[in-house]
Amino acid sequence: MNFTHINEQGYARMVDVSSKNDSERIAIAQAIVKMQPETMGKIRDGAIKKGDVLGVAQIAGIMGAKQTSALIPMCHPLNLTSVNLEFAFDEVNASIIIEAEVKTTGKTGVEMEAITAVSVAALTIYDMSKAVDRWMEITDIKLLEKSGGKSGHLVRD
């Protein structure tokens, strides 16, 4: 079996993407943070003692996307052209739904950057809110959509 990230000597390597054509790459990822309804209310009302939870999570998610290649072995450093995070309150399930859309024009996709963005944003929500709710859950981290490159446009069912 040929592995893409292993060289002839059996050592790890970063895949050579230099022969690929540049194309617009977009990825959308999601994470969900489940919590007690009271915790969600405090976040919404700005009553968490550490400060503006979603404002800090927004910045953390952007920073996470920008640092993906430093965190994930063999991820190519990318020149991101856009990182946008959105947060939605799910009152029925006492959850915050995080979505990140990441864009670039380049030779490789931004799926890992989008997934890292929502993961870091979710961890930030947890960190800033854990004093009032230690049993929050970070769930459903997944890629929702991607476009660009050979695989074209894909959307999760």
Swiss-Prot record:
Positions of substrate binding: 74-76, 112-113
Subunit structure, interactors included: Homohexamer; trimer of dimers.
Stated EC number for the protein is 4.6.1.17
Describe which pathway this protein belongs to, using the record's wording: Cofactor biosynthesis; molybdopterin biosynthesis
GO MF terms listed in the record are:
cyclic pyranopterin monophosphate synthase activity
Output this protein's name. Cyclic pyranopterin monophosphate synthase
Show the active-site residues. Answer: 127
Indicate the family of this protein.
Belongs to the MoaC family.
A Gene Ontology biological process in which this protein takes part is: Mo-molybdopterin cofactor biosynthetic process
Query: Per the record, what are the reactions this protein catalyses?
Result: (8S)-3',8-cyclo-7,8-dihydroguanosine 5'-triphosphate = cyclic pyranopterin phosphate + diphosphate
Name the PANTHER family on file: CYCLIC PYRANOPTERIN MONOPHOSPHATE SYNTHASE (PTHR22960:SF29), MOLYBDOPTERIN COFACTOR SYNTHESIS PROTEIN A (PTHR22960)
SUPFAM superfamilies listed in its UniProt record: Molybdenum cofactor biosynthesis protein C, MoaC (SSF55040)
Query: What organism does this protein naturally occur in?
Result: Syntrophomonas wolfei subsp. wolfei (strain DSM 2245B / Goettingen)
Q: Which keywords has UniProt assigned to this entry?
A: Lyase, Molybdenum cofactor biosynthesis
What InterPro entries does the entry give?
MoaC, MoaC_bact/euk, MoaC_sf, MoCo_biosynth_MoaA/MoaC, Mopterin_CF_biosynth-C_dom
Q: Which Gene3D superfamilies match?
A: Molybdopterin cofactor biosynthesis C (MoaC) domain
This molecule's function is given as: Catalyzes the conversion of (8S)-3',8-cyclo-7,8-dihydroguanosine 5'-triphosphate to cyclic pyranopterin monophosphate (cPMP).
